[in-house]
Amino acid sequence: MLVLNNFERIKIGLASPDQIRAWSHGEVKKPETINYRTLKPERDGLFCERIFGPTKDWECHCGKYKRVRYKGVVCDRCGVEVTRSKVRRERLGHIELAAPVSHIWYFKGIPSRMGLLLDMSPRSLEKVLYFVSYIVIDPGETPLLKKQLLTETEYREAREKYGNAFKAGMGAEAIKELLAEIDLDELSAELKAEIKESTGQRRIRALRRLEVVESFRKSGNRPEWMILDVIPVIPPELRPMVQLDGGRFATSDLNDLYRRVINRNNRLKRLLELGAPDIIVRNEKRMLQEAVDALIDNGRRGRPVTGPGNRPLKSLSDMLKGKQGRFRQNLLGKRVDYSGRSVIVVGPELKLHQCGLPKEMALELFKPFVMKKLVADGIAHNIKSAKRMVERVKPEVWDVLEEVIKEHPVLLNRAPTLHRLGIQAFEPVLVEGRAIQIHPLVCTAYNADFDGDQMAVHVPLSAEAQAEARLLMLSSHNILNPKDGKPVVVPTQDMVIGSYYLTVEKPGAKGEGKKFAHPEEVIMAYEEGVIELHTKIKVRYPIRGEIVELETTPGRIIFNEVIPEELRFINHLVDKKALGKIVTESYRKLGYEKTGYLLDGLKKLGFHYATKAGLTIGIVDITVPKEKQEILEEADRMVADIEVKYRRGLITEDERYQRVVDIWNAATEKVTKKLVETLEASQFNHVYMMAKSGARGNIQQIRQLAGMRGLMADPSGRIIDLPIKANFREGLTVLEYFISTHGARKGLADTALRTADSGYLTRRLVDVCQDVIVREEDCGTEDGIYVTDVKDGTDVIEKLEDRILGRVAAEDVVHPETGELLVAKNQEITEEIAEKIVSANIKKVKIRSVLTCRTRHGVCTRCYGRNLATNSIVDIGEAVGIIAAQSIGEPGTQLTMRTFHTGGVAGEDITQGLPRVEELFEARRPKGQAIITEIDGVVEVRDNKGRREIEVINQETGERKVYPITYQARIKVQTGDKVYAGDELTEGPINPHDLIKVKGIEGAQLYLLQEVQKVYRMQGVEINDKHIEVVIRQMLRKVKIEDSGDTDLLPGSLVDIFEFEDENAKVIAKGGKPATAKRVLLGITKASLATDSFLSAASFQETTRVLTEAAIKGKVDPLLGLKENVIIGKLIPAGTGMARYRNIMVQAKNEE
């Protein structure tokens, strides 16, 4: 495969004036743009054809040379080269400045790079640059100091006193001289010495200066290049000027900004030629400096330059920044052709891998293919007549379209694409009408419904793209959800209720207890009306070659007809969970092809019997339990009792509130329990059937319909202690209705906020993980992590079995009693092995983990284990980072925003839901954090003169630590308890940074993992550990240098672990002293910005800051991640984009 942009890495640096002149195709001398009469570009202006190239292909400005044959000729009259007009997108010009100006990025950024190099404060630097003060460049023999600032009067006095014995100046010229004088090597040596000697603020300042000096020294950039003598002018097509229909012109803001620079520059030139007084020239230079500032980064200093309507003009920096900037708008996401969108409707008769494509849409999308085929089949004589045929929609076109579309998959996508299942490939089937038809089973993956949702269609063009769509993206291949390995294509709603209805038993139905010799007899008896669908019968049934006698129902026999032979016989009530199990089982045993058939069978059967059952609900189905009244009266009595106690002052307001809430909660529970009993008695209650089968609705909703609504929360989230006693069947009173609107309104507001927060979290996660790719088979590490059940108090949140399944054992696991080898080291733990380990009562297993993987720039297959979407060990090249980010981000919207107010208990907020996940991943210091012990030992809790404290005493070493505790804090331990370093003494979240100090890296990793899991599990969302591990690994990949030893590393800087080890290895090999460092935990935003790739960081956040730093350091981007490669338009280095697939040619069979 020919790759045009086949380069290894990309470097950024400062441009020297000579470099800028070398890029340029000519100097822009005039501020004019185009001639208002001829509408042709003015010569030497911002759109000049002589500099930037012709506006029309192969045609010079004056029209002397027209046609391709003059290619490359430079016209002797107008000086325009005859060439393609698209060179106007790539040719730069330049402006020669009459006075140097500073580049605002380097003077104004934080920290000010210019200021650090010159050891001046940004304030004094600003005074010099904007012509407020003079600066002494060379004091000569005078008592003045170098870099001393002088006001106008002080300067005059000094001139009178010392004459020309000293040299001072103002503006960028003076700064340029100072910068040019700097000897970087000498300065670097001085600073290193100072760092060794000094302490405190001075050392920190020296460190920061050394960082900048080293950057310049290593990158080969010269400090004086931060001052501009010449400014590049970007190509005119990138700052276009277009005529609007009213004859007016719309132009890019950059043209205005360039015009101001050119105007001021030309005026300054004229003033200098005339020899104008100093003060006027100075003012003009200041204005030129401000104009250049506005061009580079408008609004960074002072008031932004505004256009018409007081709108700040968009400068070069703004062109890159933010969602609308170049990076995110045009480089990371582009609009594509061969795409369309339309409303979706359900297509129940489609197969799992098909979608219905409207005819006119298909014709438009596959137009070139149809035209080629028309010519090839001899229906049209040439491409032009073929095009005419397609445009006039001749009848023969449709037959050709049918052929073209066969075996050519299309991609369907629904926004928002929260995970990779939001884009899948289908085989198109032509349909009448203008709506896309979707298979009902893929709706869950897309989160689609048919209330007006729209979907986009894309056509993969090349043979390679088609092959990938068919082999990797076909919907029937994406049955399992990558986040937890559970099937995502499971029958829902009608299909569930159909299967449920079909497999229900009805005691005492017609013909109960009859015996049959063969399943076909049963069906016949049912069709003849001898027995019902739900009758209990006995039958001899052939299963895998042997005859078994079963007690079952005709419905279940019909249900088993769609089940593959290997999985029969399913002889129980089938609800949604059971369907999920059947699909999982089928996928594991029979692969996706047969599972596809099974799913289509279940779909057809479910719809059919849901229709036959005719399940309806009416107000009659909602039966209010008889006991409700008694329960309520009882509760009212208890509440009245408490009110009396409260009025007598026997209990506090808080206690009263808490008890009332508890009473009503208990009452609601009782009503619900009675309601369920009532419903279960009548097994065929339709409302209950829907909830029980998992088709729609849940017990909470039925409780509100037929039980009581219970307690509601007010806008702040506090529970109102006045319950809603009525249900929707009886109807609410006005007050009850009013109270319940609070909750509803808050719910809507929350959902809106949550969606945005969740999207932003996903974006940060993707950014931090995007370069985690499976790079090799085995990294050879001996490390691993020990896993046990994850518990919250005594409740098991995540079982050991789930945690070890599909992982690779890091050591042999042996049965504690029999000594039998259950799993060998480096062997995958399958379902069977996991079951054995649990049944052997082993509580702790050491597994390979991403957290301890030694692969650089990625992970290895052994440490990652099984790819959950395919149920087999992960392939090399899989972008597991992106999968992890999507798996954590996608359920984000389901997490509640609510900061729960535990009704009145010490009134403290526990952060939960999405904000808690964010707090963990951003490694923030949590609110109300727990106090943890730093040593192992025994606890003593005591009150000491009005303050509480906990002392931990280590019996072996005799070490003691005392922790003062506030009275608000809730203590978790008692005197005499044994604690270990890192255990909590009070309740609350732990600060992960403290945990690293006490328990080391591993402790912090496991804490973060368990805490994130807790939040998701509380909401009933299952996410596999390995996804969270990938993110935590990325948060911990940097070390902070403490002592640089003999290496080039700077103390206090953040360095990648592997880079740090490399540097040390080099130094040790030479017999030098290695550097020391400590691991740091970075939040995901910080970690994204600290990545090695400046392209990735710049496209994430703080674009200008990242680019400023990268340019000064002369950073090289090794293009290892996905984003960097997307930005420069290369194939991503994952999956089939890896080097090893580069030269494989895909050939379509049917063409030859």
From Swiss-Prot:
SUPFAM superfamilies on file: beta and beta-prime subunits of DNA dependent RNA-polymerase
A GO BP entry: DNA-templated transcription
Keyword S-adenosyl-L-methionine included in the entry's annotation: no
A single MF term (Gene Ontology): DNA-directed RNA polymerase activity
EC number annotated for this UniProt entry: 2.7.7.6
InterPro entries (alphabetical): DNA-dir_RpoC2_beta_pp (IPR012756), DNA-dir_RpoC_beta_prime (IPR045867), DNA-dir_RpoC_beta_prime_bact (IPR012754), RNA_pol_asu (IPR000722), RNA_pol_N (IPR006592), RNA_pol_Rpb1_1 (IPR007080), RNA_pol_Rpb1_3 (IPR007066), RNA_pol_Rpb1_3_sf (IPR042102)
Assigned keywords, A-Z: DNA-directed RNA polymerase, Magnesium, Metal-binding, Nucleotidyltransferase, Transcription, Transferase, Zinc
Annotated catalysed reactions: RNA(n) + a ribonucleoside 5'-triphosphate = RNA(n+1) + diphosphate
Top enzyme category: transferase
Cofactor: Mg(2+); Zn(2+)
SMART domains hit by this protein: RPOLA_N
Entry GO terms, CC: DNA-directed RNA polymerase complex
Entry note: cofactor: Binds 1 Mg(2+) ion per subunit.
UniProt: Zn(2+) 2 binding residues: 779, 853, 860, 863
Annotated positions binding Zn(2+) 1: 60, 62, 75, 78
Residues engaged in binding Mg(2+): 449, 451, 453
Role summary: DNA-dependent RNA polymerase catalyzes the transcription of DNA into RNA using the four ribonucleoside triphosphates as substrates.
Subunit record text: The RNAP catalytic core consists of 2 alpha, 1 beta, 1 beta' and 1 omega subunit. When a sigma factor is associated with the core the holoenzyme is formed, which can initiate transcription.
Family: Belongs to the RNA polymerase beta' chain family.
Name of the protein described by the UniProt record: DNA-directed RNA polymerase subunit beta'
Gene (name only): rpoC
